[in-house]
Swiss-Prot record:
Coiled coil ranges: none
Any GO molecular function: zinc ion binding
Native source organism of the sequence: Clavispora lusitaniae (strain ATCC 42720)
Record's protein name: Restriction of telomere capping protein 1
Top-level taxonomy: Eukaryota, Fungi, Dikarya, Ascomycota, Saccharomycotina
Pfam families linked: WD40 (PF00400)
Amino acid sequence: MVSSLARYAFNIYGDTRPRERPRRLEYPCERELTCLSQLQRPGQPPVVILGGKNCLRMLALNADNTAVVADSSIVDSARTPQKLFSVNTLKCTSDLVACGLANGTVQVYQVTSGGKNRLAYKLQDHKRVVNSLDFVDDSVLVSGSQDGTVKVWDLRTFSPRPVMQLAASHHSDPVRSCQASAHCRVRGKTTVLSVHDSGALCKFDLRATAGVGAGVGAGAGAGALLPERKWTFHSGPALSLHIHPDAEYVLTGGRDRKICVWHYGEAGSHSVAPLSIVNTYGPVMKVRWCTVAAQDPVEPTLDLPDAPDPSCLYNYDFACSYLNDDATISVYNLRRRYIPKAVVASPMRKPVQNFVWVASRTDRRLFSISKANVLVAHDLDVNDVDITRPLDNMPAVATAWRPGYANVSIVSQHKNDFELGDPVADSRDTSFDDTRDDLSHSRSTPPKERPPIVRQSTQFTVASLKSQSPVLHQRGMDSSVRDSSARAMDLSGRGLDLPPPVRPSLPRNPSQSTQGSQSSGAAHSKSLPHAPSPYVAALSVPIPLADDTVFDILAAEYHISVPDGFSLLDVCQMNARVAASVSRYRDCEIWRMLGVSLEQEFEEHQFDDPRFDGQFEDQHTDPQNASGSQHSEKDIDTKSVSSYLGNFVGSFNSNSTSTTNYGGPHRSDSATSMNKALFGSKEREGKEGKDIKHGKREKEIEQGLESPKELNPLSTRRKDSDSKANNADSSALDKPGDKSLDRSALDRSAPTSFRNKSLLQTSDGETPKDNNLSDEIHAYEPRNNLSTKVSLSTMSSQKSKAIDIKAPRRYSNNAMSASMSPEIFASSESPLKHIAKLSPSRSQTGHSWSIPSSSHDLDDENMPASVSGSLASSGYMGGPDSRSGITGTSFHSNPRSHPSFSSHRSSLTSGRSSFVTNRSGFYSSQVQPAPQLLEKVEEFSISSAEPKTSELTKAMRKKKFSYEELESSEANEKPWSLINLLEKAVIYARDQGDLVMCCTLILLFHDLFKKIFSNRILSDNACLECLALYVDTLRGKCLFTTAVNVVKEAPSSLNYKLAVYASKDVDMRYYCCWCEKLLVNETSKAKFGPNSENFGYWYCDSCSRRQSNCIYCGEPCRGLTVVVSLNCGHRGHFGCLQEWFLDEQSTGCPGGCEYVMD
């Protein structure tokens, strides 16, 4: 039942009628169409003529040009033999239709309203295709052909031969378009214009009869009339021309994507350049003036009989179609010649073949034909889906900035405003009548009175702002802007009336006044008055964060890669130093913060493991070790260097006590090298570096131990007095044959159970010969080296080269760097180099680029657990019963560090200078046991049957530090983690527009984190966009070397795309050194030819002056690739300057100026 009633359903709210689409003419043709024209008959409906391949039809339209009333063929098929013909161009007048064929024939048909058409004239004299036709009047026809001639036909004579032949030159230059001027006949002169494949615009005067009829047909230029005037501006073929409806102006369009406006009258006969140029987005095929004037025409301002008024150029629109399969027609007006007024698209998006304006004085319509063989009428006054208006869709506000001190002009202008450039006529009496001609910003008096613009002064100016950056220097504004602003303020201050503007005054806020409105008023009070422009408000805005000088310094000095022998931490410190040198303190702290976070991330992932702290229990609670420390004074004198130094180095080593033989199993080599570096001289460091090599340690292991005393450095005795304690320590280290130091390196590289010397010593004082000892040591040794290699490969650069250790280096005055030698860092096998890559405060801080007092982790939140275990076990917790009375220095090298590591630890009471303050601490007879951190693990014992696998060994086998693991690490949840800090730094730099900082971070950290960087911080496309913009900016600032380095150091995943983007063709353009105009020299090119020796760019056609000659030989610098410019401004040939600077080894400029080559 429901389904049967559904057919009776209807919309109770009524039907919504669809929006009616405007009616327009669309006529499809079964033949291929190439051209069209209009038959103008007064008092009758318009008639459109279509021509093409085997097609010549006449269409009669209705009054509003929306429908075809009648359709007929002009060619009578009954009388005309059936043969192929192709119509290439059409022109109509009165009742005559002239068509140019592809075989060079011109046929003229006479049409009637009754449909009786006949062939009236058949003109055959062209050798090639006819490209253009035009009627001078009803009896004179002009035709232009591909054979390079323009022929004039007199239809009254019925002669098949032309009465006159015109040619651009004596050689064949194909004619693309020609037209007779209707404005010159008033003075009894007939003018014909033509454009050619050479890009030339030729003007012919038909009154000159020299050579007319002589040698006709003998050649293109034989007996032909040459042009009266010839202009050449197009760089390629000129394809179309059209004369203005009211004045002696002509449009020319060419393949060079330019539309030129020329004045071909007597007043403009001496001009060498077009009046106006419109740049289009495609090669121009056809160009046409509109026959209907604009709705708001510009009134004439000049009344001269021989010069047309330029205002008529703005009263008419013009349209153009494009070559190369473009499906649009662009409509322009010289009021806004940079943006099309309308863009008409073909309905089927097929390329436009030809178009004409409708011959009407009321409607602005276009007839167009496309390669779809469809005739379409477009009404520009109605809204059509195929017509777009870019001016209506454009935003009303547009801004453009230049980095640094930007001189900004705020323009307030309506879309229909235009500039005529007319002289000023001010008739009002002022006290400045004698300087009225000097008013450069004045405008002509408008038809009606309008209030003048009075610029108000402000209390807050940009000049009152002081730059926050000391490197920014005050740059003056442009003199014209400054002078106009100051003089305008001076006039308004005196109460003088300014010349009235062309439009009503613009509302201005006080903040829109210029920079010089107050500060420059007094200085220019006696200057000539100038009226400000009613359209432009000029001001200067300083941008400290985008200063050119700072940009150049940062771009050139920032390290975008890790140099050989340095680490990423060192690069962060060096970049921080560069940022601080230009007062970019925020960037400086960002670099420091990233370096500290990078170090902490490494330490947490490498050492923050509870199993490492458990290795110290068996050493502190062993009774044999406790009793061994109470032997004699000589035993106590040989305590570890770390205990002797206090907490200065021991805190960094994290395992330093008097009973653990200074150093843990995971950083033993580094710890030994650190102590040697602190007390050894430069000569001794080279020997010690050899002693700690892996090869020598392995050799000593194979030879065995000579005595138990050599195994345990605590058994080494010294007989020096207390007053020579420091010297005794240094002398003990200076002995090259001291085996205790060699064995200490061995002990630290062995497992923890072997460093428990009480378990390895027997009652007779000898070391038990256990085969498992050497096996265990050899099994451990490669794993330790592997761990060091993994860390080094992760933190340092991929390539490593030897550094000259003899090179002089500067060091800072802190206690730590004063004791370090650069040779230790330069040693390729030194473990200290590994430590130098882990911490900026422990590595090469002594270099000249290091930043003193660089702090990190000031509140000790992220102190590794191994450090806390070392402090607890070494007796530095404080208290009267501490077994070591020496007070250590602070954990950090920063003198502002906190006195305590955390709330539950005792503070260290002395500074870094108190290495030995109380010798009685060495003789304490009782050692307090270390606090129980983890359950004791018995790794090896003599009583056990088989040795157990060390937990440290298991950890080192599995522990491999990699930054890619940070993506899933819990440390990323911390706001101060490296990933979070890097993300914030990159995003902030990107949002602030700081290209240097953003791109430097990308170049340094992208390959380090790879997937983390792309997934979390910036995608690869965003990174590529930033780097490409950075490269373009560097090239724009002439920093080409830096731009090349950025491309070379780009991340591996972006290097290829960035290199392809950066490798673009470079267009070199030279400007005149005198008039500063572009060296085009088209006049000389047309006169001498492009391959002539007289043509070049060592002179300027605009100012007729020669450019600077070679400073060495005095000859002109001909060519574009042989000129080498110096910084002093002189130039010369490449060979001449090579001979002067390279062969003769001269350093000064050949011109004798004070310039000296670096």
